[in-house]
Amino acid sequence: MGKSRGYRSGTRYAFQRDFKKHGAIPLSTYLKVYKVGDIVDIKANGSIQKGMPHKYYHGKTGIVYNVTKSSVGVIINKVVGNRYIEKRVNLRVEHVKHSACRQEFLNRVKSNAAKKREAKANGETVYLKRQAAKPRGSRIISTEGNIPQTLAPVAYETFI
């Protein structure tokens, strides 16, 4: 007998609420402002069935293209075969949240602007590119009271 593959099949854990987060939804969810062009994460809320996305879109990130009274339209790029297809999904605000994916970039832009302002006031140049972590500096370890130990592998034995 074949198994049924309904709209919400296989979502027993994906759509469940977080630990100690059951019950009424906080009002802050409804008071968030979404604007066209915002980057949002889709996270389906299992306690609200209206405007819930298909399980494929759970955990995906998209861009808001439409805002209505109680829902937002989100554009997501879906991989189909060997290409991307732009999908437009309409979701209620309970199932989306602002993405933090650009937060580091926006913070860096602000800090770079502050560094530029400060450098211009002091009349000096500033290097704003990020640098990879450099190797640690050399150290000298004393062997006084710290005798070096020779390490050797333990012979492999089979215990049956």
Curated annotation (Swiss-Prot):
Family annotation (InterPro entries): Ribosomal_eL21 (IPR001147), Ribosomal_eL21_CS (IPR018259), Ribosomal_eL21_sf (IPR036948), Translation_prot_SH3-like_sf (IPR008991)
Protein keywords: Cytoplasm, Ribonucleoprotein, Ribosomal protein
SUPFAM superfamilies referenced in this protein's UniProt entry, alphabetically: Translation proteins SH3-like domain
Molecular functions per Gene Ontology: structural constituent of ribosome
Localization annotation: Cytoplasm
Domain of life where this protein originates: Eukaryota
Pfam families in the record: Ribosomal_L21e
Biological processes per GO annotation: translation
Cellular component annotations (GO), alphabetically ordered: cytosolic large ribosomal subunit
Function: Component of the ribosome, a large ribonucleoprotein complex responsible for the synthesis of proteins in the cell. The small ribosomal subunit (SSU) binds messenger RNAs (mRNAs) and translates the encoded message by selecting cognate aminoacyl-transfer RNA (tRNA) molecules. The large subunit (LSU) contains the ribosomal catalytic site termed the peptidyl transferase center (PTC), which catalyzes the formation of peptide bonds, thereby polymerizing the amino acids delivered by tRNAs into a polypeptide chain.
Family recorded in the similarity comment: Belongs to the eukaryotic ribosomal protein eL21 family.
Subunit structure: Component of the large ribosomal subunit. Mature ribosomes consist of a small (40S) and a large (60S) subunit. The 40S subunit contains about 32 different proteins and 1 molecule of RNA (18S). The 60S subunit contains 45 different proteins and 3 molecules of RNA (25S, 5.8S and 5S).
Name recorded for this polypeptide: Large ribosomal subunit protein eL21
Name of the gene encoding the protein in the UniProt record: RPL21A
